[in-house]
């Protein structure tokens, strides 16, 4: 007989691999994860056949987020937020390259993997080698960016690990600058928009000032995520708060699966937006190719 969900512990689960580190509580995982996503099919299977244009994914290489109370949250990129949008893009015909800041392996929140979702699992299996041995972002900038680059979009998935390092990276800043200067897409969701903070590094104002975005609600990270034991403490800073201070317009204060297009910036509010953001990215990229 299955355990009643209300009997599940709201205490974060210790991660024995690190001192004072914790995974989300059993109760929080019962609320936030599921064996399947809302994937309802690919709209443009094989639509892109030329083989030139690719996606550059900037993924997380650090697992632990240090919190205000000294505890660490054991996190990574959220597998649905990473793999479901990529499923749509890859099925449409776009190849994907994976990069991390230092070239170290990508970290995933495997506890959020929808183990019965064929779209997500098949994409994970196709990308597993690249996730284990990603490119170093600085090398990508040096050798593969420029006006003639084959990358049509930069994709930054979420998961709380996106708040570690990526928001303070000059390499991420250079990559976003390149995308803006060369009319390429920037696609991100949930906590991934933390990367957009790099656009304001050492500048009087962000190059993304005035853009509108969807992002994971600060109110959940300050409230419910702590109350149900998803987080073992308060984050040192909040993504939507800092984006707003840089002059971006956060359009949501809840988690509904909302997506948004502002020029070439495509954003989603949470894992719930993964499916629709993937569709949006494919549609926008195909339209851009037709108009080139």
Curated annotation (Swiss-Prot):
The active site is at 190 (nucleophile). It catalyses: N(omega)-(1-hydroxy-2-oxopropyl)-L-arginyl-[protein] + H2O = lactate + L-arginyl-[protein] + H(+); N(6)-(1-hydroxy-2-oxopropyl)-L-lysyl-[protein] + H2O = lactate + L-lysyl-[protein] + H(+); S-(1-hydroxy-2-oxopropyl)-L-cysteinyl-[protein] + H2O = lactate + L-cysteinyl-[protein] + H(+); N(omega)-(1-hydroxy-2-oxoethyl)-L-arginyl-[protein] + H2O = L-arginyl-[protein] + glycolate + H(+). It is found in: Cytoplasm. Its main location: cytoplasm. Residues 1-12 have a biased composition (Polar residues). Residues 1-23 are annotated as: Disordered. Its EC number is 3.1.2.-, 3.5.1.-, 3.5.1.124. This is Protein/nucleic acid deglycase HchA. It comes from Staphylococcus aureus (strain MSSA476).
